[in-house]
């Protein structure tokens, strides 16, 4: 676990937030779910991921450093909810009704599927594409899929196919 760039105070705050939400969930659910493993190895634009089988939460250290408070209040409970849902209900839809219930009724956090953090510092090279209404930035992976003819992307607003600029 490489965490040398992440101040110990932030790591402690994350752990404190995780333990508080876990205790709250255990109390409300009448269970004694164990503390998940926590690592700071998530990369890219994902804020975090929950690994069910290894019962682990992986957090993005760059986004955590830039958005500490919101991260602890939103991302940590979001990923914890995935693990608790898996323990409580088994394998169900990732952001389904069980997850929403766990977030809102048990953990007391608004159930949002995605974060709104600024991604400039974690975004790699992008490629400009256009549609009728705006310019889009496609990741290297998506751009390569277009080039190889494996994928076509459309604008969510106007529905037009994206074309390389």
From Swiss-Prot:
Binds 1 zinc ion. Zn(2+) binds at residues 78, 82. InterPro entries: SprT-like_domain (IPR006640), SprT_Zn_ribbon (IPR035240), Uncharacterised_SprT (IPR023483). One of its GO terms (biological process) is response to stress. The active site is at 79. Keywords: Cytoplasm, Metal-binding, Zinc. Residues 20-163 form the SprT-like domain. It is found in: Cytoplasm. Signal peptide: none annotated. GO terms for molecular function: zinc ion binding. Its cofactor is Zn(2+). Pfam families: SprT-like, Zn_ribbon_SprT. It comes from the Bacteria. SMART domains: SprT (SM00731). PROSITE patterns: ZINC_PROTEASE (PS00142). The keyword Glycoprotein does not apply. GO terms for cellular component: cytoplasm. The keyword Metal-binding applies. Belongs to the SprT family. This is Protein SprT. It comes from Shigella sonnei (strain Ss046). The lineage of its organism: Bacteria, Pseudomonadati, Pseudomonadota, Gammaproteobacteria, Enterobacterales.
């Amino acid at each position: 676990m490489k965490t040398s760039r992440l101040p110990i105070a932030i790591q402690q705050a994350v752990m404190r937030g995780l333990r508080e939400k876990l205790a709250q969930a255990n109390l409300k659910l009448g269970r004694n779910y164990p503390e998940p493993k926590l690592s700071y190895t998530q990369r890219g634009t994902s804020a975090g991921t929950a690994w069910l089988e290894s019962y682990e939460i992986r957090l993005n250290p760059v986004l955590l450093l830039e958005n500490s408070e919101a991260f602890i209040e939103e991302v940590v409970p979001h990923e914890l909810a995935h693990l608790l849902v898996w323990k409580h209900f088994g394998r169900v839809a990732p952001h389904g009704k069980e997850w929403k219930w766990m977030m809102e009724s048990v953990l007391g956090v608004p159930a949002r599927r995605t974060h709104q953090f600024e991604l400039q510092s974690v975004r790699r090279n992008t490629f400009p594409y256009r549609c009728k209404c705006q310019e889009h930035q496609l990741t290297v992976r998506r751009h390569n899929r277009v080039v190889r003819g494996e994928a076509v992307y459309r604008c969510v607003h106007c529905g037009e196919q994206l074309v390389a600029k």
